[in-house]
Amino acid sequence: KADKEFEIGFLGDSFTEGASVTYEDSFVGIFKSSTKKDVANLGVVSYSPKIYLSKINYLLNEGYKFNQIVIFIDISDLYDDSFYYSLNDKLEVGENSKRGKKLFIRRILRSNFPFTNFYMYVLKNLNKKEEVDLKKINYTRPTFHKDAILKSIWTYSEKDFIKGYFGSISENQKKMMNTMDELYKLLEKKGIEMSLAVYPWPQQLEYDVENSEQVKMWENFCTDRCKHFFNFFPYFFES
């Protein structure tokens, strides 16, 4: 069972997976190369806390062993967790909406038919009706896609109810932290340490503050739970 034993397992979404780079160039690959530790990259695009819990539960039941799990909580996790996913009593992930079903289809295409998925992406973007007027672009300020704005706005919006979200932001925060608490208890029962890491999106650098709601909620959550809390917001705000 040597191939099922790891010092550290990294959990997260596409940022952790390193979707646009080779494994060696991902931060997990760089960490493994520099530390020589036996690590597993468990990150996959569009993952969020409900899937973190489900995946770890599955891996532990399959006999995988870890000394520590490090979870890179993404800004989009709150939206994805509340909008797309549900969990049953067996900790199995299901779809939470019609959009959720589309997300599962995209993940299947990406994993099993990468070229088909790529060409669908290209065709979709080529057929967009809206034309971009390059003369009207303000090159001194960043331009963000509406989906990215929607998923990131909760950390700096003063509203508790935001159009496009299911339920209130505060209620979704509580649900997400409850899911993460379940994950913590599952790991603790197996003698596995848990650490969390947070990092900003470009939208946070433009509209949010260094001591973001994302930082405060997870730093508070980590009290008496985490081995380490890694806050990467200061590094990005300084640069």
Report each predicted region and the residues it spans.
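Anion (oxyanion) recognition and catalysis
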Residues: 33, 188, 223
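A generic structural signal for ordered secondary structure
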Residues: 9, 67, 177, 226-227
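Membrane-embedded segments
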Residues: 1-71, 75-79
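Hydrophobic anchor at the start of a short beta-strand
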Residues: 39, 194, 229
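Short, surface-exposed linear patches
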Residues: 30-34, 61-64, 91-95, 216-220
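Serine-dependent acyl-ester chemistry module
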Residues: 75-219, 232-238
